[in-house]
Amino acid sequence: MTKQKVAILGPGSWGTALSQVLNDNGHDVRLWGNISDQIEEINTKHTNRHYFKDIVLDKNITATLDLGQALSDVDAVLFVVPTKVTRLVARQVAAILDHKVVVMHASKGLEPETHERLSTILEEEIPAHFRSEVVVVSGPSHAEETIVRDITLITAASKDIEAAKYVQSLFSNHYFRLYTNTDVIGVETAGALKNIIAVGAGALHGLGYGDNAKAAVITRGLAEITRLGVKLGADPLTYSGLSGVGDLIVTGTSVHSRNWRAGAALGRGEKLEDIERNMGMVIEGIATTKVAYEIAQDLGVYMPITTAIYKSIYEGADIKESILGMMSNEFRSENEWH
């Protein structure tokens, strides 16, 4: 692939790690953010120490506070901003773009107010004549490992397979590899909903339960993610892939996962507001729990783990009692997609 110009919107941990992947591939990378100290640090010290204490970025990776400058003459735009501001940033991008670009996102969540997936938001806010079909970049990927060039395999999903193949070529190298998929609904719901299950797995750890219990919540969590996804139109096979079970494993078993760490803290009895303040990063699984619970209620989808976590976070239920309560639920067959 020839050298491409790519704007990455959101210089957090994942946006920064992906900027390094693209820079390693010889592309022109521009990070955009709205925190002046962070932008200055990236440009002058070539570090982003809030997320990576010991990493020095290549000097060719630049950052700017000016969205127009970031978007000038780019071939592709990658959204890696928190779910709650995706629509706002997309509107700002739409007001500036003057040429067609490949639009990608690598965030994982559902919009709280509308319950919409992020690709839908981008489609609504950015006119079709200025963008490709949206490409979703998702899968098992700790930024802390990608930034040190550890082997990482993820998915590029789009309704337009050629757009997905472009992104596959854009990012893939000797340590970072993408597989294509056309099931956007499946890939996005898997990426968003696995954060809920990671909170549950972390809570079990915080409560002192062992590997049997953690394996159970991850496996049955995958079952309820699949039930909801299929109801929304996803292909159930997607959930057995990188963006499904792969992402669920990496997020539901690792201390690198902010959602797992948040769940572990909840299990230890810490208050949510203290957890969020101490972590200093967005915990997408907290907001996604509420959205997923509401969607499941509207559609009549059985999601006991999501319900237990929702009641603990939003209704003040004791998290141990909520989890143990699932052990007395009605008996069911293992393979039920409804």
Swiss-Prot record:
Catalyzed reactions: sn-glycerol 3-phosphate + NAD(+) = dihydroxyacetone phosphate + NADH + H(+); sn-glycerol 3-phosphate + NADP(+) = dihydroxyacetone phosphate + NADPH + H(+)
Species annotation: Streptococcus pyogenes serotype M2 (strain MGAS10270)
Cellular component annotations (GO), alphabetically ordered: cytosol
Active-site positions on this chain: K194
GO BP of this protein: carbohydrate metabolic process; glycerol-3-phosphate biosynthetic process; glycerol-3-phosphate catabolic process; glycerophospholipid metabolic process; phospholipid biosynthetic process
Compartments (UniProt record): Cytoplasm
Any one GO MF annotation of this record: NAD binding
Physiological role: Catalyzes the reduction of the glycolytic intermediate dihydroxyacetone phosphate (DHAP) to sn-glycerol 3-phosphate (G3P), the key precursor for phospholipid synthesis.
Predominant location: cytoplasm
Residues the entry annotates as binding NADPH: S13, W14, K108, A143, R258, V282, E284
PANTHER family named in the record: GLYCEROL-3-PHOSPHATE DEHYDROGENASE, GLYCEROL-3-PHOSPHATE DEHYDROGENASE [NAD(+)] 2, CHLOROPLASTIC
Family the UniProt entry places it in: Belongs to the NAD-dependent glycerol-3-phosphate dehydrogenase family.
Pathway this chain belongs to: Membrane lipid metabolism; glycerophospholipid metabolism
Disulfide bonding pattern of the chain: none
Annotated EC: 1.1.1.94
HAMAP family assigned: NAD_Glyc3P_dehydrog
Name of this chain's protein: Glycerol-3-phosphate dehydrogenase [NAD(P)+]
Alphabetized UniProt keyword annotations: Cytoplasm, Lipid biosynthesis, Lipid metabolism, NAD, NADP, Nucleotide-binding, Oxidoreductase, Phospholipid biosynthesis, Phospholipid metabolism
InterPro entries hit by this protein: 6-PGluconate_DH-like_C_sf, 6PGD_dom2, G3P_DH_NAD-dep, G3P_DH_NAD-dep_C, G3P_DH_NAD-dep_N, NAD(P)-bd_dom_sf
